[in-house]
From Swiss-Prot:
Gene3D superfamilies the record matches: GroEL (3.50.7.10), GroEL-like equatorial domain (1.10.560.10), TCP-1-like chaperonin intermediate domain (3.30.260.10)
Keyword annotations from UniProtKB, A to Z: ATP-binding, Chaperone, Cytoplasm, Isomerase, Nucleotide-binding
Subcellular location: Cytoplasm
Protein name per its UniProtKB record: Chaperonin GroEL
Entry similarity comment: Belongs to the chaperonin (HSP60) family.
GO molecular function: ATP binding; ATP-dependent protein folding chaperone; isomerase activity; unfolded protein binding
Gene assigned in the entry: groEL
GO terms for cellular component: cytoplasm
């Protein structure tokens, strides 16, 4: 049976939904700025989570009243979308959405046409975004990166850590965040290409204490076939033995007599050769082998391209300055591949990243790109307790996203200053149509909100601060941490352009659509009063 629905119209619908918007935004906005507080979230399992990450808080909010919940979910959409695009700035986005809805509803209630108001909002936001892009300046060097990260994470240490990581692996590199069981937070950088396959047999190690094998100036045989018969690779082995070099074999698998022969020779000390299985699966495996071949200047020996193992000569093998193999990983450092070919391969992967629609594929391509072009850095987060660890990890992930965004589109004065700076651009807009003008004014007013909130969270009167910032020269903003007015960029208080831009665009998009709501429909909750027969009150104690 279809559930009955309850329907609300016009003013009532908008008011109830606005209540939900306010509940969500008021919860999130206490975290804004350097003196913002945290919010604690109850978790069904384990310790509660303490965080100041807007989107993490927003995701937790579900309201009982269906209409209020609709409002809250709409604003949650703003936070999530901003998080997807820029990875940070979710609190700002939520705050802006609330401000636009609040100002907009005043006008719509007063009889303005919501469609025209929305038009005005869109015009003003376009103008503001243009203004933000004009004040934006590119990220220059490690200093800037450290600043962006430090502001986002509210922690100078983290800023330095991320800047170090970016410096080591370059903009193409991949930086991941992992939990560690130590107290401190540290950086681990893997130079060269690493994949997660280790030696096939522990007898192949060269250092029995560390249980790892390291091959200097090694040859690398790359194939997608299974090697069982030593005769297949004998010709090429003999050539390498004569040169006194070492060999790494990357193949689908190596077993039986072939494996036994290699191990026996290693133990006798005649020849050092380590075999590992090829990384990845299916098509991705082929691509990864191709990557390794490009990096080391070798060829993939595969029947698909008509190359057979017994025809392999030394010039088909890859070369690398050193290879390190542990039980779980293989790392190839300084492959001797042709620079131009590596560059072509990198560009090819970049093109695939642009085209792919699957998030999973994009991540895997990004990893391959990093291994070819930069390297991989791992930030290992440590803390005294689980609760603090989770909180730190969230902040580092946000800071990392902010840093990437800054590299892409540059930086602007932080602390809400950039929004205040573009108000005068919006003021230049004019419209003959009264209601469109109202939309423009709504945005003008909402752009003050971030500065107000940061001031308010620092215990200062927001109106005074915003007036002061608006009437100071460009680039002067309010430093809430030290309670003074400074040149934001010089003081190192910066935000990524992409984050600020996305926050405003997403907020305006959802908020202006919200204003055009004329009816809201929700399920009527069923009243389930009859307990099961024979078990009065039994159900109360159960979940």
């Amino acid at each position: 049976m279809e559930m009955a629905k309850s329907i609300m119209f016009g003013e009532d619908a908008r008011r109830s939904m606005q209540k939900g918007v306010d509940i969500l935004a008021d919860t999130v906005k206490v975290t804004m700025g350097p003196k913002g507080r945290n919010v604690v979230l109850d978790k069904k399992f384990g310790a509660p989570l303490i965080t100041n990450d807007g989107v993490t808080i927003a995701r937790e909010i579900e309201l009982e009243d269906a209409y209020e919940n609709m409002g809250a979910q709409l604003v949650k959409e703003v936070a999530t979308k901003t998080n997807d695009v820029a990875g940070d700035g979710t609190t700002t986005a939520t705050l802006l959405a609330q401000a636009i809805i609040r100002e907009g509803l005043k006008n719509v209630t007063g009889g303005a046409n919501p469609m025209l108001v929305r038009r005005g909002i869109q015009m003003a936001v376009e103008e503001a975004v243009k203004g933000i892009k004009e004040i934006s300046k590119p990220v220059e060097g490690k200093e800037d990166i450290a600043r962006v990260a430090a502001i986002s994470a509210d922690d100078k240490e983290i800023g330095k850590l991320i800047a170090d990581a970016m410096e080591k692996v370059g903009n193409e590199g991949v930086i991941t965040v992992e939990e560690s069981n130590t107290m401190g937070t540290e950086l681990d950088v893997v130079e060269g290409m690493q994949f997660d396959r280790g030696y096939v047999s522990p007898y192949m190690v060269t250092d029995t204490e560390k249980m790892e094998a390291s091959l200097d100036d090694a040859y690398i045989l790359i194939t997608d076939k299974k090697i069982t018969n030593i005769q297949e690779i004998l010709p090429v082995l003999e050539q390498i033995v004569q040169q006194g070099k070492r060999l790494l074999i990357i193949s689908e698998d190596i077993e039986g007599e072939a494996l036994a022969t290699l191990v026996v020779n290693k133990l006798r000390g005649t020849f050092t050769c380590v075999a590992v299985k090829a990384p990845g699966f299916g098509d991705r495996r082929k691509e990864m082998l191709e990557d390794i071949a490009t990096l080391t200047g070798g060829q993939v020996i595969s029947e698909e391209i008509g190359r057979d193992l017994k025809d392999v000569t030394v010039d088909m093998l890859g070369r690398a300055e050193s290879v390190k193999i542990t039980k779980e990983t293989t790392t190839i450092v300084n492959g001797k591949g042709n620079k131009k070919e590596i560059e072509d391969r990198v560009n090819q992967i970049k093109a695939q990243i642009e085209e792919t629609t699957s998030e999973f594929d994009r991540e895997k391509l990004q990893e391959r790109l990093a291994k070819l072009a930069g390297g991989v850095a791992v930030i290992k987060v440590g803390a005294a307790t689980e609760t603090e660890l989770k909180e730190r990890k969230l902040r580092i992930e946000d800071a990392l996203a902010a840093t990437k965004a800054a590299v892409e589109e540059g930086i602007i004065p932080g602390g809400g200053t950039a929004y205040a700076m573009v108000i005068k651009e919006v003021e230049k807009l004019n419209s003959e149509t009264h209601d469109i003008k109202l939309g423009i004014d709504i945005v003008k007013k909402s752009l003050e909100e971030p500065v107000r909130q940061i001031a308010c969270n620092a215990g200062v009167e927001g109106s005074i601060v915003i007036e002061k910032v608006k009437h100071s020269e460009a680039g002067i903003g309010y430093d809430a941490l030290n309670n003074e007015y400074v040149n934001m960029i010089k003081a190192g208080i910066v935000d990524p352009t992409k984050v600020s831009r996305s926050a405003l665009q997403n907020a305006a998009s959802v908020a202006s659509t919200f204003l055009t709501t004329e009816a809201a429909i929700a399920d009527i909750p069923e009243k389930n009063d009859t307990p099961m027969p024979g078990a009065p009150g039994m159900m109360d104690g159960m979940y």
